[in-house]
């Protein structure tokens, strides 16, 4: 079996047979947290990110409330950046390895949002499995492995967190 009991073949088969009731659909309502623009620089420094997050935490929370995402994707920002700035529910998935995927529940005003924290997509050129460099497909493979693992452990988890989009008429009634 593969990583966390989910094999690469299972992920590929899953993606190939996806329809609107699958995890690909849930990602279509994802919000990607961008704590700070890097001013055109290639890299951000973690200590700078932490300061930007502290200064902008209320704006960030308000953006999450407004957008009401079904999933939030963070680019490796939990540990030592936003971990003490939000309320957190339980850790749903704790990956391991060079670039681990972690899935938490972030809580704002008593509402829980699945928060997937993994390396930023711009780091895909740096993703290594041993001596072999991986492509962007590896990024999505790791993401789907984690999501499928959560779904196996908690059937119906992802569908239970589908939120109304902020611009849907039904959300305004």
Predicted regions and their residues:
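C-terminal capping/extension of enzyme domains
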Residues: 47-61, 83-173
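Acidic catalytic loop of the alpha/beta-hydrolase fold
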Residues: 80
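Redox-cofactor binding/interface segments in oxidoreductases and associated redox assembly factors
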Residues: 74
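Structural motif
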Residues: 70-71
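A polyanion-binding, active-site-adjacent surface
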Residues: 1-67, 77
């Amino acid at each position: 079996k593969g990583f966390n009991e989910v094999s690469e073949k299972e992920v590929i088969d899953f993606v190939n047979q996806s329809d609107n009731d699958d995890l690909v659909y849930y990602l279509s309502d994802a919000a990607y947290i961008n704590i700070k623009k890097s001013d055109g620089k290639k890299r951000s420094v973690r200590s700078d990110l932490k300061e930007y997050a502290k200064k902008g935490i209320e704006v960030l929370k308000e953006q999450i409330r407004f957008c009401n995402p079904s999933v939030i994707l963070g680019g490796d920002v939990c540990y030592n950046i936003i971990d003490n700035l939000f309320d957190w529910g339980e850790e749903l998935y704790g990956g391991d390895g060079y670039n681990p995927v972690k899935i938490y529940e972030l809580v704002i005003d008593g509402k829980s949002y699945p928060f997937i924290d993994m390396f930023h997509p711009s780091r895909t050129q740096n993703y290594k499995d041993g001596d072999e460099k991986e492509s962007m497909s590896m990024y999505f493979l790791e993401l789907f492995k984690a999501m499928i693992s959560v779904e196996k452990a908690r059937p119906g988890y992802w569908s239970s967190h589908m939120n109304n989009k902020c611009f849907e008429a039904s959300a305004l009634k």
